[in-house]
């Protein structure tokens, strides 16, 4: 794993969480780089960090937030709004998220599969550059977790954690 792989690490966890939610009837899209949304409302977030010693990962940390029964801010949604009450217990979803982390550990060995599955779950097909306001078509996700963009003959990529790119979000 390279330093620029922190973004792919986060997407791997987001994908595993999305799969876990889907297995319980909740369809969540991946809002690059680190959120899960239902419609346009945020259900969960992922904060990845890889700690390196030289070129080797020494420690992988992941922060996971999932709205289950809690009050949510405007623009958010909780599982209690999506599932019957008996299926919205915090301890139950703690277990489901631990299972998602185990699944992410398995997925990490297959970055091409992660990218393909994450691309199918992307929240939109075009984005506006926050700095310029220009609209870009989303072409996919790079093996380092970058969001790949095209505007006519121009291409760029956005990265959120580590690595190098033409543009940043």
Residue ranges and their predicted role:
Residues 1-169:
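Catalytic beta-strand/loop module used to bind and position nucleotide/cofactor moieties
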């Amino acid at each position: 794993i390279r330093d620029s792989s922190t973004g792919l690490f986060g997407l791997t966890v987001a994908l595993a969480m999305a799969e876990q939610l889907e297995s319980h009837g909740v369809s969540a899209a991946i809002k690059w780089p680190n959120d899960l949304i239902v419609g346009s409302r945020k259900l969960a977030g992922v904060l990845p960090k890889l700690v390196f010693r030289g070129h080797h990962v020494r420690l992988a940390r992941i922060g996971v937030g999932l709205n289950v029964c809690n009050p949510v801010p405007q623009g958010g949604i909780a599982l209690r709004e999506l599932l019957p009450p008996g299926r919205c217990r915090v301890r139950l979803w703690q277990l489901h998220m631990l299972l998602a982390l185990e699944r992410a550990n398995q997925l990490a060995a297959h970055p091409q599969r992660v990218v393909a599955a994450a691309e199918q779950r992307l929240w939109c097909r075009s984005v506006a550059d926050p700095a310029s306001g220009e609209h870009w078509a989303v072409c996919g996700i790079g093996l380092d977790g970058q969001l790949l963009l095209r505007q006519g003959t121009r291409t760029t990529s956005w990265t959120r954690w580590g690595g190098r790119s033409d543009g940043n979000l």
